[in-house]
UniProtKB/Swiss-Prot annotation:
Transmembrane segments: none annotated. It comes from the Eukaryota. The gene is DCAF8L1. WD repeats lie at residues 194-233, 237-278, 284-324, 332-372, 388-427, 435-475, 479-518. Belongs to the WD repeat DCAF8 family. One of its GO terms (cellular component) is cytoplasm. Pfam families: WD40. Residues 1-122, 562-600 are annotated as: Disordered. InterPro entries: DCAF8, WD40/YVTN_repeat-like_dom_sf, WD40_repeat_dom_sf, WD40_rpt. It comes from Homo sapiens (Human). This is DDB1- and CUL4-associated factor 8-like protein 1.
């Protein structure tokens, strides 16, 4: 047969023609090594030649010498050796040998992978155990720095008492309330309990003689907290839980402002704080209304904020009490609000916080929607400007003189800002150790000169920090196994009222014989930080969704408890939610918004 390229006959008869007819063929196993260089070439590229010179293999058997002169017109591309099977000629074919080698290599690689240390999900390194040790050590150092010993307090009890006896200290009570010595002696004095659900708001009147509380049961209770007795208990008129209830100043305790999860802003008219004449609606937000900000000396005016991003100013002397001040926006997008606080030194300025990381300060005289959405200045910790997960502010509050502003961040820390600094200024102090994740928690100043910072926590404790040093100086179990949300300092005595998810109001006084031992503080701080870091590492859900699920679960639990009354609470429908206005003009609708109080 002559040499010609491209001879492509049919599949050869494997019985009569030799697959290995080649000039280089050698008899015996010795030929295997000589032809090994041609094996892979035949398996991948078909080669043609005369006399069936198919350099597609060098494997020989005993019959190979008998077929050396056989004319074969088949080419290597006509035969696929991998389809032949291993037993046909007594030797494994190329494809199968390669597969076995690959399987052996894979098994070796798997063994090596099992021997390799597992990657640390936090740092990305290979030594996970060492990473955990380093993390624990760093955590211990951080906790020690937050609870380190403080220098001796400058205010001394015996010296102050002696000076008072001699008449040289006219401000003993004022100074005592701001003394670290008294704060470190706080202990639970007693419980006030008449509610049938969690208590979401507490507020002292201007003189400090009465305490108002309300919550899930939709009732407002006015307490003579010293005698531990309720003096007034009435229906609020809200459809869903009351979030805040506050006494107006300079009104003889005759007016109480309220807001709730149904978006309503209502006012209760009291008679000598012992009888409620009626409650009426004065404004309506399109979402929950979380907080009120009373004008310090006015018995008529206050501000409200809601999750509809609207701030209302309410003036009870007007026929239509509510007027819209501003709609909070960021890049033309509304920002729902959780909190509002009025500057006590400048009643035209107020601060708000909510669904993003910015504390916004407005001046009611200078709100220009075309310029920075009307914002006077904004503050936020610089590391939260471009954080990887959404951040929310649950509470903002001004200091006693309006020069400082506290902001508590959801699942973050508490930050102190200088309100007089320019727009975008960094925080001044940072307060750590608590946990603010499940509910909308309050933060507050404590002391006549705002010497301390106090906050509740998901762990059920009350934390006190010294404002100047950021050190934790007091740590109290405020709600066993539950959450502390509200903290209300007495206007002039060293007394603190707190409430949370249980049915009681707690009264704290500095009556402990010695300073409270911070027993278990390090373990609680460590647990709070680890849980927060774990949640941030596995962050998949928004704060609003978590809050909604939490409140629904909480209300369902309360509904099955003994003593829970059916108040006929209903969620507002879409048509009602579209209303964001003050009380209706018509007398008929006015009558519907007015609820006659029925004391219990």
């Amino acid at each position: 047969m002559s040499h010609q390229e491209g001879s492509t006959g049919g599949l050869p008869d494997l019985v009569t023609e030799s697959l290995f007819s080649s000039p280089e063929e050698q008899s015996g196993v010795a030929a295997v090594t000589a032809a090994s260089s041609d094996i892979e070439m035949a398996a991948t590229e078909p080669s043609t030649g005369d006399g069936g010179d198919t350099r597609d293999g060098g494997f020989l058997n005993d019959a190979s010498t008998e077929n050396q002169n056989t004319d074969s017109e088949s080419s290597s591309e006509d035969v696929e050796l991998e389809s032949m099977g291993e037993g046909l000629f007594g030797y494994p074919l190329v494809g199968e040998e390669t597969e076995r080698e690959e399987e052996e290599e894979e098994m070796e690689e798997e063994g090596e992978e099992e021997e390799q240390p597992r990657m640390c999900p936090r740092c990305g390194g290979t030594n996970h155990d060492q990473c955990l040790l380093d993390e624990d050590q760093a955590l211990e150092e951080w906790i020690s720095s937050e609870t380190s010993a403080l220098p001796r307090s400058r205010w001394q009890v015996l010296t102050a008492l002696r000076q008072r006896q001699l008449g040289s200290s006219a401000r003993f009570v004022y100074e005592a309330c701001g003394a670290r010595t008294f704060v470190q002696r706080f202990r639970l004095q007693y419980l006030l309990g008449s509610h049938a659900g969690s208590v979401s708001t507490i507020h002292f009147n201007q003189r400090g003689t009465r305490l108002a509380s309300s919550g899930d049961d939709l009732r407002v209770i006015v307490w003579d907290w010293v005698r531990q007795k309720p003096v007034l208990n009435f229906e609020s008129g809200h459809d869903i839980n009351v979030i805040q209830a506050k006494f107006f100043p300079n009104c003889g305790d005759s007016t109480l402002a309220m807001c709730g999860h149904d978006g309503q802003v209502r006012v209760a008219e009291l008679i000598n704080a012992s009888y409620c004449e009626n409650t009426k609606r004065v404004a309506k937000h399109r979402g929950p209304a979380h907080e009120l900000a009373l004008e310090p000396d006015s018995p008529y005016k206050f501000l409200t904020s809601g999750e509809d991003a609207v701030v209302f100013t309410i003036d009870l002397r007007q026929d239509r009490p509510a007027s819209k001040v501003v709609v909070t926006r960021e890049n033309d997008k509304k920002v729902g609000l959780y909190t509002i606080s009025m500057n006590p030194a400048n009643i035209y300025q107020f601060a708000v916080g909510g669904h993003d990381q910015f504390v916004r300060i407005y001046d009611q005289r200078r709100i220009d929607k075309k310029e920075n959405n009307g914002v006077l200045k904004k503050f936020t910790p610089h590391h939260l400007v471009y954080c990887d997960f959404p951040t929310n502010i649950t509470c903002v509050v001004y200091s006693h003189d309006g020069t400082e502003l506290l902001a508590s961040y959801n699942d973050e820390d508490i930050y102190l800002f200088n309100s007089s600094l320019s727009d975008g200024a960094q925080y001044v102090k940072r307060y750590k150790g608590h946990r603010n994740n499940d509910t909308i928690k309050c933060v507050n100043f404590y002391g006549p000169r705002s010497e301390f910072v106090v906050s509740g926590s998901d762990c059920g404790h009350v934390f006190f920090w010294e404002k100047s040093s950021s050190q934790i100086i007091q740590f109290m179990e405020g709600d066993r196994g539950d959450i502390v949300n509200c903290l209300e300092p007495h206007p002039y005595l060293p007394v603190l009222a707190t409430s949370g998810l249980d049915q009681h109001v707690r009264i704290w006084t500095p009556t402990a014989k010695t300073a409270t031992e911070l027993t278990g503080l390090k373990d609680v701080i460590k647990k709070n930080k680890q849980e927060r870091d774990e949640d941030n590492l596995n962050y998949t859900d928004s704060f609003d969704n978590r809050m909604l699920r939490f409140f629904v679960r909480h209300l369902l639990q309360r509904a099955h408890q003994p003593g829970w009354r059916d108040h006929g609470a209903e969620f507002p429908d879409e048509e009602e939610l579209d209303e964001s206005s003050s009380t209706s003009d018509t007398s008929e609708e006015e009558g519907q918004d007015r609820v006659q109080c029925i004391p219990s």
